Amino acid sequence: MAPKFEWWAKGNNNNTRKGTPVVVKMENPNNWSMVELESPSHDDFLVRTHEKSRNKNARQLTWVLLLKAHRAAGCLTSLGSALFALGTAVRRRIAAGRTDIEISSSGVGSLQKQNHTKKSKLFYSCLKVFLWLSLILLGFEIAAYFKGWSFGTSKLQLQFIFNKGFFDWVYTRWVLLRVEYLAPPLQFLANGCIVLFLVQSLDRLILCLGCFWIRFKKIKPVPKPDSISDLESGDNGAFLPMVLVQIPMCNEKEVYQQSIAAVCNLDWPKGKILIQILDDSDDPITQSLIKEEVHKWQKLGARIVYRHRVNREGYKAGNLKSAMNCSYVKDYEFVAIFDADFQPLPDFLKKTIPHFKDNEEIGLVQARWSFVNKEENLLTRLQNINLAFHFEVEQQVNSVFLNFFGFNGTAGVWRIKALEDSGGWLERTTVEDMDIAVRAHLHGWKFVFLNDVECQCELPESYEAYRKQQHRWHSGPMQLFRLCLPAVIKSKISIGKKFNLIFLFFLLRKLILPFYSFTLFCIILPMTMFVPEAELPAWVVCYIPATMSFLNILPAPKSFPFIVPYLLFENTMSVTKFNAMVSGLFQLGSAYEWVVTKKSGRSSEGDLAALVEKDEKTTKHQRGVSAPETEAEKKAEKTKRKKKKHNRIYMKELSLAFLLLTAATRSLLSAQGIHFYFLLFQGISFLLVGLDLIGEQVE
């Protein structure tokens, strides 16, 4: 007879678990999550029947499934709401958009600008022809795919197709054409671009290794200890030379107050500093506002003067050249230059000027830029990645190992003797900063880059402003290369420096980079989808670009989540850079066009913002509490209220977007996985940029 366990159940009645319940955690009504679910314990089987246990488990499982379904429905609802909101925003921005072709055609400008518009339309027409051709070829390939023809069919296998009809004959001839005539030159061009790509990747890798070596060895420019200690102690024998501060500006009423307040609060003896506000504005309201700001600081005791040119030729270079011709400039030894949106900290001069002491070979000390709006939107985040690599790696490595780098045009201190020895500011290009740096290098002057001295500024927040800035930055170097190549060859600098200047500084980093980036990823890669006999390896399309993007993002580690958008956006910008490079190389009209980068007037971080606020309060107190606003301020406020924001529709980018998406469809038929995903996401990236859905809208 089987033993009875009733006595055991009675003795352990208080300690026996009757089964583990379902524990459900509810953070909010739309977010349910199950934490724990266990089957009844072994002891429960001793006191409860199997039938009750099965019923309870079924009920528990039903509740869990219902909760999971509720959570999934909540996620789908949230996703649908987000997509609907995104679609509404896209529709609203596109409805208010205007194409760049319409805008460029509507404006009446000089003959050079009209010629540039014609060349731009020609480039756009070529892209449209390429797009329509790809759509026709895609139709052929889809028809062939459903007929079951192999995309890699050889000549011998194609002979049986000749008698099947006109379409079969046309497709057969197309395959023979691409095998015998199109694939070989396309593969040759692809191989050439791959070689350029590898050379540029090697250059970037060497720069990164140089940066790692600098960090490992803790190498950085250090001024002589006595010059720093003299400045800190206020010794009468301290190195306190006469310093001229220049702020060139043109119709930049959003930022003039911040920059003027910043330079007027530089920590330097009042008798040894003079501030020049070089206003090239053609707007009377802006001129009045800047004059009033200068007059306010003059009342507060700052040595500041306002200059406005009658003859406004030469853009920024002409403005600086005119200011250097003033008679009192001969009394000054150094000149610090800041753009209108730059806000140096009070100790800027005390950190830069000491590097000149007892070293007559140093002609320039350049500080690093930092950005007050780097997290404003996706566009500013991607720009921050680029510029962080430029300063942390390129400028620092070239400074340490070569004593030469391109002057950034602002946040730098020049020895006036070096400027005069190099020929001063010239208006022959739109990159006057690079021009003077190259000429100073040819005359033997050395440069110092300070990675630990930062000067705050703004990044362009709209794609239109960023696009114009990049066009100027990439067309100017090609102009300069054509003009200064004979001088570089005839100069007395070493062969190694000539090689670095010609092949690395100009050709590789200014010409080859935008050329191969656009040609390889926007032209050759889509063509290889329709001419599969020419191939691009997967490591060229995916692995090496991903590695290079990883290296680029190292100086800005907080931006690591944006590595994929950064890679796609850089390829998207290759259209603008390639167009600018061609304009500068062949002296097209747009290469001579200077457009002031649009500013938003964002305040800097920390004490400077409080300082500006304090200065504004002081000004209001001086005017009187009941004093009315000036006429210029009223007009500026009225003009600001009239401004409306709109979108730009960029037709070239849209054409390339549809071209890449068409090529992605073709690669899907060939089952090329990596190529398909790259073309798909790159096409979407071009589509977003073409519809101006990245960055702020333009006023």
Curated annotation (Swiss-Prot):
Glycyl lysine isopeptide (Lys-Gly) (interchain with G-Cter in ubiquitin) cross-link, renumbered residues: K617, K620
Regions of biased composition (Basic residues) lie at 637-646
Name the residues annotated as catalytic in the UniProt entry: D280, D433
Predominant cellular place of this UniProt entry's protein: Golgi
Phenotype of null mutants: Normal xyloglucan (XyG) levels. Plants missing several xyloglucan synthases (e.g. CSLC4, CSLC5, CSLC6, CSLC8 and CSLC12) have no detectable XyG levels and several associated phenotypes including reduced stems height and leaves area, as well as shorter root hairs and reduced pollen tube formation ability.
Membrane topology term reads: Multi-pass membrane protein
Subcellular location, record wording: Golgi apparatus membrane
EC number(s)?
A: 2.4.1.-
Q: In which tissues is it expressed?
A: Mainly expressed in roots, flowers and seeds, and, at very low levels, in seedlings, leaves and stems.
**What are the GO MF terms of this UniProt record?**
glycosyltransferase activity; protein homodimerization activity
Please list where the region (Disordered) is annotated: 616-646
The record's keywords, sorted A to Z, are: Cell wall biogenesis/degradation, Glycosyltransferase, Golgi apparatus, Isopeptide bond, Membrane, Phosphoprotein, Transferase, Transmembrane, Transmembrane helix, Ubl conjugation
Q: Would the keyword Cell inner membrane be found if you checked this record's keyword annotation?
A: no
Q: Which family does it belong to?
A: Belongs to the glycosyltransferase 2 family. Plant cellulose synthase-like C subfamily.
Return the protein name: Probable xyloglucan glycosyltransferase 12
- Give the organism the record lists: Arabidopsis thaliana
